[in-house]
From Swiss-Prot:
Record protein name field: Uncharacterized HTH-type transcriptional regulator VC_2383
Annotated HTH lysR-type domain residues: 1-58
Organism classification: Bacteria, Pseudomonadati, Pseudomonadota, Gammaproteobacteria, Vibrionales
Family: Belongs to the LysR transcriptional regulatory family.
Any one of the GO BP annotations: regulation of DNA-templated transcription
DNA-binding region(s), residue ranges: 18-37
């Protein structure tokens, strides 16, 4: 009961509403409220207060999350490690959506013929790392920088170049660009590099696909990774590479709990990713 309440509070701190928290935990909104109420009663502290359509955490709740959040995820992970991965145990690979769209279609279709007992889910990199730490995901396939002190086994598959997409020809580096969400910890490094070149992030999207489509529609040029060019089949006349941005790349990693690397099924999945992604990353843009 106590662990359920803590897990619910941790999810609520990210999702901000009872309904979204319930969706993440596959429980009803009333069950979320009941779990939080029981936790408040157990601890003798008020943990949440209404804030319009959202829920705001109290200072006591923030302190509780800061002190036990990492430990709770690690406990989940240790319990997860006790599970034996049989040939038919369902494996979950949590991935960056752009990496799935850009690189994994054909590779994963072939791999599923050999091992049908696994699924793909998509998340942002910080959440992927959390899910692997807690055992909710067996494997993470991440774009962008990983958070510090994650404690996971990682494999660096490559560094994906960025391209500027524009409807009209570009003869010089734009002063404004549509970017992805730079508040995402996996992407914050991009902000410093753009600032160095005097480029202002005019709009920040939650999707590289949305950024590219706006650019192709004539809104503003957009900064997108090479996989988006391939996925959307963007014509070469709309793709522009600038020497000033040559060092701007996004690292691609696999992450997992070290103990899971002993599984031959996990090793086979890692090999499939390792064989496919570097070729795509290093391939010339369209």
């Amino acid at each position: 009961m106590l662990l359920e309440g803590i897990e619910t509070l941790l999810v609520l701190s990210k999702e901000k509403t009872m309904s979204r928290t319930g969706s993440q935990l596959y429980i009803s909104q009333s069950a979320v409220s009941k779990r939080i109420a029981n936790l408040e009663k157990k601890l003798g502290k008020k943990l949440i207060v209404p804030a319009g359509r959202h829920i705001k955490l109290t200072a006591d709740a923030e302190q509780l999350i800061a002190s036990i959040g990492p430990t709770f995820n690690e406990l989940h992970g240790l319990i997860f490690e006790q599970q034996t991965l049989e040939d038919n145990t369902l494996l979950r690979m949590d991935c960056s959506e752009t990496l799935v769209a850009g690189y994994l279609g054909q590779t994963m279709g072939q791999h599923r013929k050999q091992d049908p007992h696994w699924v793909i889910t998509t998340n942002h990199t910080p959440r992927i790392v959390e899910n692997v730490q807690s055992g909710k995901a067996t494997l993470g396939f991440c774009a962008g920088y990983l958070p510090a002190n994650h404690g996971l086994l990682t494999f660096h598959l490559g560094d994906e170049p960025f391209t500027v997409i524009s409807q009209a020809p570009l003869h010089a580096l734009p002063s404004e660009l549509i970017t992805n969400d730079l508040a995402n910890p996996a992407n914050t490094y991009q902000a410093a590099m753009l600032h160095k070149q005097g480029i202002r992030p005019a709009m920040e999207m939650d999707s590289y696909t949305a950024a590219a489509q706006l650019a192709l529609g004539g809104m503003l040029p957009a900064l997108v990774p090479r996989s988006i060019v391939s996925t959307l089949k963007i014509e070469p006349q709309h793709c522009f590479d600038f020497a000033e941005l040559a060092d701007l790349t996004r690292p691609i990693h696999i992450c997992l709990r070290a103990s899971r690397y002993r599984s031959s099924r996990v090793q086979a999945l890692i090999t499939a990713l390792h064989d496919a992604v570097p070729k795509a990353v290093l391939a010339p843009s369209a």
